[in-house]
Amino acid sequence: MAVERTLSIIKPDAVAKNVIGEIYSRFEKAGLRIVAAKMAQLSREQAEGFYAVHRERPFFNDLVSFMISGPVMIQVLEGENAIAKNRELMGATNPRDAAPGTIRADFAVSIDENAVHGSDGPETAAQEIAYFFESDELCPRTR
């Protein structure tokens, strides 16, 4: 199995609910290590750039407005099959379809305010990590 890194964002709705620690605990219990983290208030430009792949989609403006509505926690997770493991922890995009016990089932209220973002593959993970973190901000967890 490959050790991977993936980007995770705890979105404004979950930050406002004060569940950052509960979500971090789930990452760690699943064997994922946090190798970088920061809280940020995204600018409109940052959110538009990050979600540029969705620019032509009808939900783009609402997504950007939501992502700048409050602070977010941005972290890089590392571990065996980190991308798939994080996506499993998150649950389906729509919390109504998310399996019980997943982050979205427990903390999200709608498909729009769905608590977390996670990279969907190795290439996007690398791009998304580089969007928010310089390489010297990533701290290998060797102990």
Curated annotation (Swiss-Prot):
Broad class of where this protein is predominantly found: cytoplasm
Catalytic activity: a 2'-deoxyribonucleoside 5'-diphosphate + ATP = a 2'-deoxyribonucleoside 5'-triphosphate + ADP; a ribonucleoside 5'-diphosphate + ATP = a ribonucleoside 5'-triphosphate + ADP
Residues that, per the record, bind ATP: 11, 59, 87, 93, 104, 114
Active site annotation, chain numbering: 117 (pros-phosphohistidine intermediate)
EC numbers: 2.7.4.6
A Pfam family the protein falls into: NDK
CDD domains: NDPk_I
GO molecular function: ATP binding; metal ion binding; nucleoside diphosphate kinase activity
GO cellular component, one term: cytoplasm
UniProt keyword Ribonucleoprotein present: no
InterPro entries: NDK-like_dom (IPR034907), NDK-like_dom_sf (IPR036850), Nucleoside_diP_kinase (IPR001564), Nucleoside_diP_kinase_AS (IPR023005)
Gene Ontology BP terms: CTP biosynthetic process; GTP biosynthetic process; UTP biosynthetic process
Domain of life, source organism: Bacteria
Presence of keyword Chaperone: no
Cofactor: Mg(2+)
Alphabetized UniProt keyword annotations: ATP-binding, Cytoplasm, Kinase, Magnesium, Metal-binding, Nucleotide metabolism, Nucleotide-binding, Phosphoprotein, Transferase
SUPFAM superfamilies given in the database record: Nucleoside diphosphate kinase, NDK
Quaternary structure note: Homotetramer.
Family designation: Belongs to the NDK family.
Alphabetical list of HAMAP family matching this protein: NDP_kinase
Protein name, UniProt field: Nucleoside diphosphate kinase
Species lineage: Bacteria, Pseudomonadati, Pseudomonadota, Gammaproteobacteria, Methylococcales
Encoding gene (name): ndk
